[in-house]
Curated annotation (Swiss-Prot):
Classification via InterPro entries: Rad23 (IPR004806), RAD23A/B_UBA1 (IPR041811), STI1_HS-bd (IPR006636), UBA (IPR015940), UBA-like_sf (IPR009060), Ubiquitin-like_dom (IPR000626), Ubiquitin-like_domsf (IPR029071), XPC-bd (IPR015360)
Protein name in the entry: UV excision repair protein RAD23 homolog B
GO biological process: cellular response to interleukin-7; embryonic organ development; nucleotide-excision repair; proteasome-mediated ubiquitin-dependent protein catabolic process; regulation of proteasomal ubiquitin-dependent protein catabolic process; spermatogenesis
Region (Disordered): 80-175, 236-276
Residue stretches of biased makeup (Low complexity): 81-143, 252-271
SUPFAM superfamilies according to UniProt: UBA-like, Ubiquitin-like, XPC-binding domain
Similarity annotation: Belongs to the RAD23 family.
Length: 409
């Protein structure tokens, strides 16, 4: 028989197999034909007519119609996300280890050592993934600058790591962000995903509730549909939706503040218990959880903002995605303070949180941009939220708001 298989990313392929064979044999055939990295047997879940196929059961028992398709869901191993950012950075120091060692000796003899060269000897002896991206590329750039110009070595060596750090930091941040949001769908992809999961035999309301509970992660949404939504997240998602506009204007900026203020906390608190547990005591995280539960599609933008403000925190999130999602699913604690309004001119926009008012300063140009977005017919709270989430880019914010309106319709 010929089995048509379809992934949650809407990739379709066919496998020829004897119906007397077991489901596990089909999984092994998928792995051999499509690759062990993309479709490992241990990570495959085959779903037909809303049921997970049992490995030891023969295919004929499920009466699979060749005109229909079997859904393939692949769960990625947790360890894969850890070395990803570091592997791209390690190749450069590895290839220049010999040059680096000679560079270190010449710099040591210089009359005035440059502080930026302190980490030069590190990559020669340290290669684990825990080494930071910013310290690794420094010797590579130092070696390149030392070789052609030995006399004025101090000037280029001191300045070159800055450029290298910024580029490597950006690339590692983008890798972390892609890793953290790779499983999320928004916009038109969201609608396609709803249709795709409905084709497994579920009602639209069930699918939307599962996607909401999983924050638009299709793999986890299917698991919720099969196993049940934990903690009745379905009912929590509908509680108090109007508060989004009244609790405060730029809640995404509160998340940025949380990211900026938790760098030190991460290093001190993560030693005891789970690395993300410290977030529970952060009022900014409470606000973020409330925002995301009311509007899950904001999660990618907020993760991107965290990546800019605190890449270490984003790395922790990407390494512990399931725990992070679980924390976001927890009931929101009662927040103190009432919602605030907007100021005029170059004044500030009020934001509620933790029993007192916070103000975000905006320029007259930013105020005008917010007013133009409000003129499109969106409430002020949502406009400000979108404007800050989109890095004060008016066009992106407008597209985001229009997309939100389309999704709700």
């Amino acid at each position: 028989m010929q089995v048509t298989l379809k992934t949650l990313q809407q990739q379709t392929f066919k496998i020829d197999i004897d119906p007397e064979e077991t489901v596990k044999a089909l999984k092994e055939k998928i792995e051999s034909e499509k690759g062990k990295d993309a479709f490992p047997v241990a990570g495959q879940k085959l779903i037909y007519a809303g049921k997970i196929l049992n490995d030891d059961t023969a295919l004929k028992e499920y009466k699979i119609d060749e005109k229909n398709f079997v859904v393939v869901m692949v769960t990625k191993p947790k360890a894969v996300s850890t070395p990803a950012p570091a592997t791209t950075q390690q190749s450069a120091p590895a290839s220049t280890t010999a040059v680096t060692s000679s560079t270190t000796t010449t710099v040591a003899q210089a009359p005035t050592p440059v502080p930026a060269l302190a980490p030069t000897s590190t990559p020669a002896s340290i290669t684990p993934a825990s080494a930071t991206a910013s310290s690794e590329p420094a010797p590579a750039s130092a070696a390149k600058q030392e070789k052609p110009a030995e006399k004025p070595a101090e000037t280029p060596v001191a300045t070159s790591p800055t450029a290298t750090d910024s580029t490597s930091g950006d690339s590692s941040r983008s890798n972390l962000f892609e890793d953290a949001t790779s499983a999320l769908v928004t916009g038109q992809s969201y609608e396609n995903m709803v249709t795709e999961i409905m084709s497994m035999g579920y009602e639209r309301e069930q699918v939307i509730a599962a996607l909401r509970a999983s924050f638009n992660n299709p793999d986890r949404a299917v698991e919720y549909l099969l196993m049940g939504i934990p903690g009745d997240r379905e009912s929590q998602a509908v509680v108090d939706p109007p508060q989004a506009a009244s609790t405060g204007a730029p809640q995404s900026s509160a998340v940025a503040a949380a990211a900026a203020t938790t760098t030190a906390t991460t290093t001190t608190t993560s030693s005891g218990g789970h690395p993300l547990e410290f977030l529970r005591n952060q009022p900014q995280f409470q606000q973020m959880r409330q925002i995301i539960q009311q509007n899950p599609s904001l999660l990618p933008a907020l993760l991107q903002q965290i990546g800019r403000e605190n890449p270490q925190l984003l790395q922790q999130i990407s390494q512990h995605q399931e725990h992070f999602i679980q924390m976001l699913n927890e009931p929101v604690q009662e927040a103190g303070g009432q919602g605030g309004g907007g100021g005029g001119g170059s004044g500030g926009i009020a934001e509620a949180g933790s029993g007192h008012m916070n103000y975000i300063q905006v320029t007259p140009q930013e105020k005008e941009a917010i007013e133009r977005l409000k003129a499109l017919g969106f409430p002020e709270g949502l406009v400000i939220q979108a404007y800050f989430a989109c890095e004060k880019n008016e066009n992106l914010a407008a597209n985001f708001l229009l997309q939100q309106n389309f999704d709700e319709d």
